[in-house]
Each structure stands twice: as C-alpha cells, then as structure tokens.
Amino acid sequence: PNGFTYALVNVPNSTFPNTTFNLQVKEKDSDNRAVQSSFRSLWIDMPRSLLSLDVAIDMLRYITDEETIDRLSSGSQRERERKFRDFWGEKDPTPKTEYNELMAEYYRRVDYSYENFTTENTIGYNSDQGEIYIKYGPPDNIQRKYPTEGATVEIWTYPNRNFVFEATSGFGDFRLKSN
C-alpha cells in the first residue's frame, strides 16, 4: 500500500560482532533501484571496560604474560581488535556463538573493581582488591575488623583461600597484607 513493500529478512545476529552494518536491498528486474539502510548489532549490557581497547588489553595483565599483552597492543586498531578477539576466541566456552561468556564475566569484574575500589589515589582495577576480585570473582564472605590499635582489616574468604587487606589511609585504600 502507498508504494511501500515490507519484507522480513532473517539476519543471524549471533554471528555479528558488536558494530554497525549497511544493508542494501535491490529490487529484482528493476532499473537497478536500491535502498540502503544502516543497522547496528548491539551488545546491550556490554561491560564498559570493553569500550576502550587499550583498557581491555591492559586488564589482561592479571591472566596472561607481558609478551602476550605486547603482541596484542601492537599494530593498527583493526589488527589489535582482531588479535584481541582471537585471544578471547581461544578461551570461549561456546565458540559457535558471538557471545563469549568468559570474556563478559572477566570484564564485568573489571567494571565492578573500577566502580567499587577506586579511591582518590588508585583506579579500582589497579588496586590490590581490584586485582583479587578480577582474578577470583566475588568472595564467599567479607569480614571487616576495626582493631583498637592499628589499621582496619578486611578479610575476603574464598574456598580454600583467604585474602587479608589492610587499610592504608582511612579513605578506602586497602593493600593486600597476606593470602
């Protein structure tokens, strides 16, 4: 009606990366008329730390060696993105889908560390608490002790492991004391 034709096109979204695409539709047996439109494949709850490739690569320091980080950091933006995707692709528990659960969880932990452990002196994912949270996830239990003498102590409990942090400033800065 009114010169419009509607068509449903099955687009397998699970195979598209988080980016913008152009879709061009040509009418068959016409004067080569074409309609072009942009669409975006969007990861709605993408961790913010993945918005910066530099940050995303830097945060790998908790799970890989410096040589790998140097390799991922070299090259053009496109090459670095490809190498970054390849790095996580090798670790993807569901490689036939675009969504990588392991990568998503890792960078959610990076975001959490930024939001919860950042102080005036330290970005949260660079803090001792941030590092432990990124590596091990949320602790099973957190206990905070306020001794009458000495600094506040926070104990994070994981299966078969405890991490003890000691306050250094009274403003949320904690340093790993023992594990």
Where are these regions (language model features)?
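Residues within mature, well-folded domains
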Residues: P1-L8, N13-N18, N32-N179
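Short, conserved beta-strand segments of beta-strand-rich sandwich/propeller modules, principally
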Residues: N18-Q24
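Beta-strand-rich extracellular modules
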Residues: K26-S30
